[in-house]
Amino acid sequence: MLGPLVVLASWSSIDERVKEFHVALLLLQTAMLGAICSIDLLLFYVFFEAMLVPMYLLIGVWGSTERQAAAMKFFLYTLVGSLLMLIAILAVYFLAGQGGARSFDYASIYNGMLGANHEIAQCLAAKTCDTGIFSGSFHNEQLSPMAVALLRYGPWMFFAFALAFAIKVPMFPVHTWLPLAHVQAPVAGSMILAAVMLKMGTFGFWRFAVPFFPAMARMYQPLIATLAVIGIVYGAFMCLAQTDIKKLIAYSSVSHLGYCMLGMFAFTGEGATGSAYQMLNHGVSTGALFMLFGFLYERRHDRLMSSFGGIAKVMPVFTAFFVIVTFSSIAVPGTNGFIGEFLVLLGSFKSNLPLALSIAATTAVVLGAAYMLWMVQKVFFGQLTHEANRSLKDLGRREVFATLPFLALILVMGLKPQFILDVLNPSSQKYIARAAYGADADTSKVHITVRTLGPAVAEAAQPHLLVPGAIAFPSLQARDR
């Protein structure tokens, strides 16, 4: 869906090298689809790296005044992380191939390491081995050679995968390339970067890092969850300090994607489902914010909040659309953002993570509302103090058509989320099972349901937590471990 909308949103903003621009868009789409669909680790790496070139061109050729520096910083950051991942992929290839034919096939590698992960799970349960510094304190005779190798070198392989994906997310403190890239990128680059490309990082954790190294993921769980919460709070405070609208939206991505990582590393059914839902939410909401600001930038060629004020008087349709998307971004009940953040926070509170992390993440929701509503008030309301704003034209037909699909998704995903949750639940069940040291965990109670209020809810036997927006969340009893 995003590809045609990106073309529609950029229709009048790109007037140089138009053919090359669309070629770069198509190449980027191909690379992203290839990375998502790959069931071969080496092929995944090729597509994961191939994304860099067209995005580098989108920023470096069609970006703003500092586009070269932004493009180079983006390229170098992600390249360094990816090279470490390549080393880890080769290590996994040789490790999983012990005693059999070596392959980069996902299923072959996962199944090849499954037995070793089972051994490690039993060893850890019996406390005869450790996932700490690996000083040789475990009993080698109890483990197969593959399990010993995985226990000894697995943390470094997990770290290599995790660093590559953390840069792509991006997580604090390897996030510094993102604000500059977003600010300098054209509207198409920002939309694709926010809506899809950043999710390659969270997708990588979900599909590769945690399933291949469940014990190591548990070992790093406190660190990654802490960095996720730091990113949530840090991103919110950085947004409060911004005067550049596009940079504010960019830092909000750091905060929102922190919720995705927190839910993923809560290792609960609610957290996993909420994390996946939040990935979709961020793509819809932040992609729409960048697109709408791109429409405004085409008219004024200015990114500072102080250059606007009172434009709701001259652009009422644009204002209404922007406010709806803002409500989605701050997780107002009835919008898509509420479902994802609620499930993530619920999963975090039910997990074994320190309570302080869950409280800090919950507090940051208020900060998110503060910086977004502050920006809306500064830009759209008050007096028309700048003469240039009086002649601004409201959205045209093309721009309205490009925005309506985003608005529809915001409302449908917020009011009727069950059809998406039904799709996400099986993946969440598999993720929780694979995170349980590769063991066959009981995931029968991982299924998450959200029902519209009605007679059936009143008759339900389970207690329900009722929240605004005509939504009921049935209580979930499982720890999902």
Language model: regions and residue ranges:
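Hydrophobic residues within the alpha-helical transmembrane core of Major Facilitator Superfamily
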Residues: 4, 30, 80, 205, ...
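Predominantly late transmembrane helices and immediately cytosolic-facing juxtamembrane segments
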Residues: 172, 286-289, 356-391
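Cytoplasmic/organellar membrane-interface segments at the starts of transmembrane helices
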Residues: 87, 91, 98, 315-317, ...
